[in-house]
Regions:
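Short, structured secondary-structure elements
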Residues: 2-181
């Protein structure tokens, strides 16, 4: 999270205790969550007037999920599972379902294909460390991903649809909702 303060360095606490104290701080998740949010392309809501365009209102729930997951020492593999399939892993768990904000974050109201293409592009870069953009249209001479591979990968995301659920106790999504896949 944050580097130790001068006071923390001057105490008689051991190095290990100071590190444990810093890792237990909620600032740890805030600091490192910021880096993961860059990788996973987190962006707050924006639209035109009241109309949703490229992201989701209340996507801050997903941002907080990232921070809390890091602070709880949730494994990276579990975080990825919840981001891609939290609604299937544990549909009754709000925490697991909130992870699917990853899929909702790049929602594009005008064209589902644009949303799917962006999700494929972001997922391949973030989780596989490769680009798949060229393979959408053709096999590339030097890339290991063929056009068939691209559409096989896309088939994983095809069943996903966006849901905009009001949270328990709220009367509408606009007041406080949970964007999810």
């Amino acid at each position: 999270g944050l580097p130790p303060t001068t006071e923390q360095l001057l105490t008689n606490a051991s190095y290990e205790d100071t590190v444990d104290q810093l890792l237990a701080s909620p600032h740890y998740g805030e600091r490192w969550g910021r880096h993961w949010m860059d990788v996973w392309r987190y962006s707050d809501w924006y639209g035109l007037g009241g109309m949703l365009r490229h992201s989701q209102k209340h996507l801050w729930h997903w941002r907080d999920w990232i921070i809390n997951s890091l602070n709880k020492d949730k494994g990276y593999d579990r975080m990825i599972q919840e981001m891609l399939a939290g609604d299937e892993l544990d549909p009754q768990s709000r925490e697991a379902v909130t992870g699917t904000g990853y899929l909702a974050r790049s929602y594009y109201v005008f064209n589902r294909n644009t949303w799917l293409d962006a999700t494929i592009e972001h997922s391949a870069k973030a989780f596989l460390g490769i680009t798949m953009n060229c393979a959408k249209c053709h096999d590339h001479k030097y890339d290991p991903i063929s056009q068939v591979d691209y559409y096989n990968y896309r088939s994983f995301f095809e069943p996903h649809h966006l849901r905009l659920d009001a949270l328990p106790g709220e009367t509408s999504f606009d007041k406080n909702g949970l964007p999810r896949a």
